[in-house]
């Protein structure tokens, strides 16, 4: 089957994001990826951390629930203060970058990122925010979900996606 694979997904510098190492180990890898990619986004767009700090920027993320490893579940039981739920994906970004707009995670299955973009556009048009960070994340730790989707004919025959394609 076809999949977009990420190398070194566990390589994360928690100290840069002011996250204790033990807390980072307990966090959903999607949260760590979203933090890293948000930093990349601002950097590639030419914004410094000082320029975006305190800005009226909303964070709108599409996300699917993440499988919890046994290690993360045990750590969360010992340290319930660690923000590990899917709803914290946007909050972590807003907090680290000191963004003052709304932060939300949307789960509408395959349309989560698109729905997030629609919400962000509406907030921009209404003047609720001045800028928006919009994205989507769905990390699958193994191939079981993909195989289930294949068995139920939820994927294309090529086992890859063809968004907005005539196929």
Language model features with spans:
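Cys-dependent condensing catalytic cores that perform Claisen condensation/acyl-transfer
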Residues: 1-167
């Amino acid at each position: 089957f076809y999949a977009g694979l990420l190398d070194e997904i566990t390589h994360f510098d928690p100290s840069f994001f002011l996250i204790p190492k033990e807390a980072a180990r307990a966090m959903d890898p999607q949260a760590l990826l979203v933090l890293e990619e948000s930093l990349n986004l601002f950097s590639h767009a030419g914004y410094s951390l000082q320029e975006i700090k305190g800005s009226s920027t909303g964070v709108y993320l599409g996300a699917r629930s993440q499988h919890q490893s046994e290690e993360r579940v045990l750590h969360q039981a010992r340290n319930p203060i660690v923000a590990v739920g899917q709803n914290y994906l946007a909050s972590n970004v807003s907090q680290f970058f000191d963004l003052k707009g709304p932060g939300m995670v949307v789960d509408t299955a395959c349309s989560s990122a698109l729905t997030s973009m629609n919400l962000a556009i509406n907030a921009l048009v209404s003047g609720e925010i001045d800028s928006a960070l919009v994205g989507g994340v769905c990390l699958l730790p193994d191939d079981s979900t993909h195989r289930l989707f294949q068995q139920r004919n939820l994927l294309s025959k090529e086992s890859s996606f063809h968004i907005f394609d005539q196929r």
